[in-house]
């Protein structure tokens, strides 16, 4: 999906604003209540910024191994991982502690740079159950790609 799928103001915010402001802009655009951005560092995902994530969860997600939880799976697969309802999910994709967030409709997408390198993972979530459309997943991937260029 072309970057034009995101409003110009959001694209500019993603490129230049402090990361917390950029993440909040993504949450606002997709009508989400919580989010995270992890960067790849030494083969694992390191938390860079989180918004509206309970402190006990933040302490658990400071470092996420590739392949663990939905962020780690998005990194491993290099594709979006979504859950309609994190609270009732029994697929094994989410870590049990993720339920503490109180979020339901969750989406994690890889942040891939223009040279194809995995730079991190952008995660967003809604407080209610939600099925993410392919177009929405692609738009969040665009947002993550812009973040990866920072």
Which residues are covered by each model-predicted region?
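Flexible loop/coil segments at beta-strand boundaries within sensory signal-transduction domains
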Residues: 112-118, 127
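Regulatory loop-to-helix N-cap segments in sensory/regulatory domains
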Residues: 125-143, 150
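Regulatory sensory and allosteric helical modules in signal-transduction proteins
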Residues: 40, 44, 56-89
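A short, aliphatic-rich beta-strand micro-motif
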Residues: 104-113
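Signal-transducing coupling segments at domain and membrane junctions
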Residues: 55-57, 84-105
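Signal-transmission linkers at sensory-effector interfaces
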Residues: 1-17, 119
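Helix-loop-beta substructure at the N-terminus of cytosolic sensory domains
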Residues: 11-48, 58
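Amphipathic alpha-helical regulatory segments at dimerization interfaces
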Residues: 8-13, 20-29, 73, 77, ...
């Amino acid at each position: 999906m072309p970057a034009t799928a995101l409003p110009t103001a959001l694209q500019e915010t993603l490129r230049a604003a402090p990361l917390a402001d950029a993440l909040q802009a993504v949450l606002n655009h997709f009508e989400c209540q919580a989010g995270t951005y992890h960067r790849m560092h030494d083969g694992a995902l390191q938390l860079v910024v989180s918004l509206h994530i309970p402190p006990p969860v933040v302490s658990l997600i400071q470092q996420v191994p590739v392949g663990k939880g939905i962020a780690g799976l998005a990194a491993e697969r290099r594709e979006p991982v979504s859950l309609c309802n994190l609270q009732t999910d029994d697929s094994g994709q989410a870590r049990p502690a993720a339920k503490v967030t109180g979020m339901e409709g969750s989406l994690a997408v890889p942040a891939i740079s223009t040279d194809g390198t995995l730079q991190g993972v952008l995660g967003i979530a809604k407080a209610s159950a939600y099925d993410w459309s392919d177009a929405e997943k692609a738009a969040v991937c665009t947002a993550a790609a812009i973040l990866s260029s920072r």
